[in-house]
Amino acid sequence: MAIGLACLTLTACQYDIPITSAPTRKVQEPLLGDWTSADGKEKLKLRSLDGSIYIVYYDGDLFRAYHSDIAETPFVTVQDLNSNDRKYAYVIWKLSEDRKSLRLRNVNDKVVPEGIRDSAGVVALLTKNARNPELFGEEIEFKKEK
């Protein structure tokens, strides 16, 4: 999951609706486990809740996440479970071929603004901007713990 992390750059948990209302694929086993940021300051734990939903523990907070693939891009819908409003973050994540590195990036709210009223509107904007280099924020890299 690419997570501009603070709402997994999850200070990006600002959207009222998910990208997709249901997961678009199953949990990927290689993503599960404990991860540490490249600078060693942040810890990320990914667990499977069921066959399609991840539970994410990040910096003392819990999140629910699932794949929301759009326009051949591996988006992830991330929901903050600690807040009362349960808002969402939109991220991408990319697992390295050796499965030891996970890169996360959040969707830029200047390209996909808050206030979209339904998932169809979110999907339309993400599809339209899939090749836009401004779509994503900074990348955060995590290394898998042994």
Spell out what each predicted region is.
Residues 14-31, 38-146:
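Calycin-type beta-barrel ligand-binding domains and close structural analogs
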Residues 9-12:
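C-terminal motif of bacterial Sec signal peptides marking the signal peptidase cleavage site
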